[in-house]
Structures are given as structure tokens and as C-alpha cells.
Amino acid sequence: MLATAKTEVVVLTAQKWFPNPFQTQVVDQHIESRRALKYLGVTIDSKLTFRDQIVSVATRAATTVANLSRLMPNVGGPRSSCRRALMGVANSIVLYGVEIWGEALKVEKYRKQLASVQRRGALRIACAYRTVSEAAVLVISGVTPIDLLGHERKRIWDARRAGEGPLKDVRTREREETFALWQERWETGETGRWTYRLIGQIRDWVLRDCGEVDYYLTQFLAGHGQFNAYLHRMGIRNDPYCFYCPGVADSAEHTFFDCQRWSEIRLRWREEKEVPQRRSGEIRRNGGISCRSSVEGAWYCEVMLTRSRSIIRYKRGEGFSE
């Protein structure tokens, strides 16, 4: 028997002439239609735009990201792989029922609303400055863009309904399709170009079997950190020039590849024998980072930025020296 007191109605129509609200009678109860209602956890609106669903999950996910962020300081705290697993909770909230409403992600304003929440989580995973672009921080942290994840899940669901082979094969195929779409977006993007020079192939970077990003390595990969060119852009330094190379902008590229102040460290890194199984990897300024160099690269970047920070603080009169 229908419980009329608990009954809700939403009229699915795009016709402007249709009366809104619409009233109907069930038994002895008059029921007025609503603009949207929640059914099995998905908010359905009368025009099937799923705007209310996206606003709802974005708000809930933002709260989750904010709470988890308290566990993830820039220095210390969980490793990036653990951070990624924790932030997966926010993805689960956002992507619930995406097989039904996934087409709404093709609307740019809806995509941006969810991407904004995901970006905040990716910043915590990579321990990055908040000025790092969405494209760059997602690559550095290894987090697939939320709209591509949503479309992937919808394609998998459609393939299962069509009986297109074993689920494992379908998932593998669609994951490769997502990597291809992400790679195309990465290659044609306008932001994160320094990161693109270092991490050209997303699939290789995300699926690497060694190396964790942290506060120090992320500064190198993003180009946002203890570099005078960046600090000058943020209004912290009076000029963008290197302390040790007059007239040369102190960018991440200059610090890690050219600055004579760090030539001894660069040479020591190249000759280091402590990690022989990783020796075949290298970092190239235009050719990208070999995944096999991640362990060496993390050590190299941490030493470089720790020393750089000490020197910068000393120059600012805070009492830090080498």
C-alpha cells in the first residue's frame, strides 16, 4: 500500500508550458510536485540536468577533503601513496551513481565545480603550494581528473550492460582509454608546462613502482617553491634573480640544472653508488624523468631544496646557515 504522506513527486519534462508546481491526488492526499528529489542517493531534478546532485556531492566531498587535510601537513605526515588512498574517500562521494548522471560532467561549469574540490585534495597529496595549476598538481599527485574518471565508470557500466567480455578486460581497456584522453589533454594544455617538460608521459609516471612525491620534490616538479623567480611573482622578493648568478632569474630550471652554487651536489648525485639498481634512470630537463630515477631524484631534490631554503633564510637574516 502506498504511504501517501511520504510520497514525493517530480515531473520529468523540459516543456516550459507544463504547470510548475504540478498537483495531483493520490487516494485522499494532494501532492505537489517538487523541482528535485533524492532517490537511492541520487538527486533527480525535473529537467534531468543533475545540477542538484553535483552541488550536493561537491559540498560533501569538500567537507571530507577539509577534514582529511588536517592529517596531511606539507612536511611530515603520511606518504603520498597513503594520502592518495585517504583522498579516495572524496572521489567515492563524488562518483556515487555517476553511471546515471555522468553525462552532466560534459557541462564545463559542473566539471569545474567538482574539479575544484579534487584539486584541493591533490594539493594535499603532493604537498604543493596552492598556486600550482590543476593540470600540474593532478599529474604530480597521480590523481586522474574527476570528469575522466566519471566517464570511465560510465563506459564500464555501459559495456557490462552490453555484455562486452569479462569485467577485468573491460576495466583494463577503459583505463587505457582514460590514460590516452588524459595524455591528450596534458599535451595540448596551456598550464603546467614546466611540469610537462619533466613528466611528459602520464601513464609511465602514474604506474611507476618506486618513489614518493613530497614537499621538496613537488617544488622541483611544479616550479613553485623556494625559487626567487616564483617568490618575486608572489610579491615576496624584490627581484627574481639568483643570489649566486648575477642577472639570471632563479627559476626551478636554473636551480636544478644550471646554478653553479649547486654544481657539486649535481655531480655527487650523478656519481652516487648507494642505489645501484636505479642507476639507469636520469633526469633530463627536456626529456622528462625516467621512472627508474625516482628514488635518486627524491634524494637529489630534497638536498637541493633543503640547502636552498637554509641559504635563503640566512640571507634574510633569520640565522640559518649551511
Residue ranges and their predicted role:
Residues 110-131:
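Two-metal-ion acidic nuclease core segments, chiefly of the RNase H-like superfamily
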Residues 205, 210-322:
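Family-specific functional microsites
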Residues 5-15, 85-86, 109-114, 136-143:
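A glycine-rich phosphate-binding loop feature that marks nucleotide/adenosyl-phosphate handling sites
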Residues 136-216:
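Extended C-terminal regions of large enzymes
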